[in-house]
């Protein structure tokens, strides 16, 4: 049996591993992937149940703001964003959500 998984997309955060640990401490497997993951690469991952867009202070690279691919929004995965104001997610947080907020997200997607 394969594990359910939350994908964390790195959009310039320094706290990706903190979020991954928080999710794992809640009993759910997570993986960190780069912001420019393609639709095909994401769909090739097993048992993805939700996505966290994790922005941060390192969002600008070579004068360009790091963006998530717009096509990812149309895939039907539940998504939340952390410190990524451009997102089109159901829930947006300015800072790392507490365990209660993260549990609410996980229960929303039935994990």
Tell me what each language-model feature is:
Residues 1-108:
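N-terminal beta1-alpha1 cap of cysteine-dependent amidohydrolase-like domains
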